[in-house]
């Protein structure tokens, strides 16, 4: 029984890594992610961000790019001043991961602030081993899927939480 649980854990880790890599590179998943976010904004009454989800990568930034900075919803120069209510996700899953990590860091540090205070808070957090290790965006996404699947399996098996 214990060996079976260990094997299941190892298999889940492998599947998680492969799934995350596959989803991170899948344009259709990125488009569905943006459409889902827009639908959630519509349901919750938030104003959806203007995005182009038809394959144009509007996050390519270079000085000779014809649309350099024209479509950006995010201030890339000041990563510590994100307002949680105004965060806009994009059709780039790696950019979404970066935004998620910024939000997570800000929540851990108790809100905004400058980068020096964030660094000192991070140093304090690393010395405290009693706090659980925080998850990256893809792990969080995968665990959300896994939790939903387990809940559905429990419902099918007649178990209640």
Swiss-Prot record:
Disordered: annotated segments: 47-83, 104-137
Residue spans of biased composition, Low complexity class: 73-83, 115-130
Superkingdom: Eukaryota
Residue stretches of biased makeup (Basic residues): 50-64
Descriptive protein name: Putative uncharacterized protein DDB_G0280905
The species this protein was found in: Dictyostelium discoideum (Social amoeba)
């Amino acid at each position: 029984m214990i060996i079976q649980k260990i094997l299941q854990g190892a298999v889940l880790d492998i599947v998680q890594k492969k799934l995350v890599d596959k989803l991170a590179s899948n344009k259709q998943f990125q488009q569905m992610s943006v459409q889902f976010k827009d639908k959630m904004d519509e349901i919750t009454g938030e104003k959806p961000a203007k995005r182009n989800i038809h394959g144009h990568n509007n996050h390519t930034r270079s000085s000779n790019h014809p649309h350099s900075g024209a479509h950006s919803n995010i201030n890339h120069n000041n990563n510590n001043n994100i307002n949680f209510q105004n965060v806009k996700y994009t059709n780039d899953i790696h950019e979404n991961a970066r935004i998620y990590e910024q939000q997570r860091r800000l929540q851990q540090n108790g809100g905004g602030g400058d980068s020096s205070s964030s660094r000192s808070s991070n140093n304090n957090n690393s010395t405290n081993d009693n706090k659980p290790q925080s998850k990256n965006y893809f792990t969080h996404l995968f665990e959300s899927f896994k939790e939903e699947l387990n809940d559905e399996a429990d419902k099918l098996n007649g178990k209640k939480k």
